[in-house]
Amino acid sequence: MKFFLLLFTIGFCWAQYSPNTQQGRTSIVHLFEWRWVDIALECERYLAPKGFGGVQVSPPNENVAIHNPFRPWWERYQPVSYKLCTRSGNEDEFRNMVTRCNNVGVRIYVDAVINHMSGNAVSAGTSSTCGSYFNPGSRDFPAVPYSGWDFNDGKCKTGSGDIENYNDATQVRDCRLVGLLDLALEKDYVRSKIAEYMNHLIDIGVAGFRLDASKHMWPGDIKAILDKLHNLNSNWFPAGSKPFIYQEVIDLGGEPIKSSDYFGNGRVTEFKYGAKLGTVIRKWNGEKMSYLKNWGEGWGFMPSDRALVFVDNHDNQRGHGAGGASILTFWDARLYKMAVGFMLAHPYGFTRVMSSYRWPRQFQNGNDVNDWVGPPNNNGVIKEVTINPDTTCGNDWVCEHRWRQIRNMVNFRNVVDGQPFTNWYDNGSNQVAFGRGNRGFIVFNNDDWTFSLTLQTGLPAGTYCDVISGDKINGNCTGIKIYVSDDGKAHFSISNSAEDPFIAIHAESKL
């Protein structure tokens, strides 16, 4: 009995770090700005059969409808109420999506905007996605309801009321982030309204939350809110399951607020990951892929079991957030596929794949003046995600998660789950390879010359299908074939001019 109790306690303590994905599913995808009806379809027709574990959805609660500029993506980070009513859909559509995705084993993670309400300069009225009245000037949000008592105006000590100095941890938490009205999260009433919103989502069936702007909330206030949350819906999750929590904290070093301040609440976004990996794959600042041998904690990242990792996110793919120009995105497709491939093959962290939309980039003095542009739309109504005959997406939806190289690496990660990082090779430059136990092996050529070498893969003998150049279909391979001999060795040849200069094989790609 003692042993059982000990296990139970450990299980309980670790609960918020576990993603609640179905057994054998190891990644989630951010379907940025997608409509709930399209996500429900995507769960059924693509994500479930391809082995994706879940979807991070855009904030589902009512937000300001901003018309200047016209309907920017960031309007969704300006809450008006906790009604489930946005451009992505209403509450019925949200419930339908959660049910349909859970029924095929794909989880839903909500981007929860709980640090603040709308900007202080937004005009009073009903320009909101559900028509609720709000008056930022008088701190009046009757659809919640919040009033002047529920904000941090009295606590913030800066002249402007906004955050002015990131070296002052107190103002980062108690003042307004770019003018957004900062909620008084130490008040039990405010905590209760937020918990009520999150519990509504949990009861519908969501599996966890991305906590937006966690750096701007005191870790103790977050904990107090999490302590009020329900267990997950037992229709889909084991009894007693806790929501998966991952907190958005931008910590590139050099500031008093650290990612580690938040480990007690759940996982944390590791922004160093994409910033550093982009620098390495771009070969900037003398970086090379051979240096990736001790990738992860060896690079000064947080512990693997606390990290949520990604190559790019909705902020830094358009120059917001962290990482600057080193961040790789779908605009840099060749290098991007290599970076995502490396991330999905490497055991560090819990992985999130990005799925974007195109927008008309326009650089002036190094800045994209169109970085605000919202999702593909007809006069403000988000466009359907159409699927082309070749399985790519139309209507300016990029759907990186459907690119063969990325989708197949999501499966690679599932196949090698739990296997150690083994058989590292590098040429001292940008040709590297590594295995995952006896289940998978991947080789990269990011040098300006051909790679041709026999390497120890650790895999059983046989013919394998490279899942980067093709697919294993009915026992045949549409891409490059790799022959592993009885001693586990295989010859790899990768031209530096190859469309995708990397090769990946795994136990389930064996012919």
Swiss-Prot record:
Q: What EC number is given for this enzyme?
A: 3.2.1.1
Which reaction(s) does the protein catalyse, per the Swiss-Prot or TrEMBL entry? Answer: Endohydrolysis of (1->4)-alpha-D-glucosidic linkages in polysaccharides containing three or more (1->4)-alpha-linked D-glucose units
Active site: residue positions:
212, 248
Q: Does the keyword GTP-binding apply?
A: no
Q: Does the keyword NAD apply?
A: no
The residues that hold chloride are 210, 313, 352
Which Pfam families has this protein been placed in?
Alpha-amylase (PF00128), Alpha-amylase_C (PF02806)
Under the heading InterPro entries, the entry gives: A-amylase/branching_C, A-amylase_C, Alpha_amylase, Glyco_hydro_13_cat_dom, Glyco_hydro_b, Glycoside_hydrolase_SF
The GO molecular function terms of this record are: alpha-amylase activity; metal ion binding
Q: How is the cofactor bound?
A: Binds 1 Ca(2+) ion per subunit. Binds 1 Cl(-) ion per subunit.
Report the sequence similarity comment from the record. Belongs to the glycosyl hydrolase 13 family.
Assembly notes: Monomer.
This protein is called: Alpha-amylase 2B
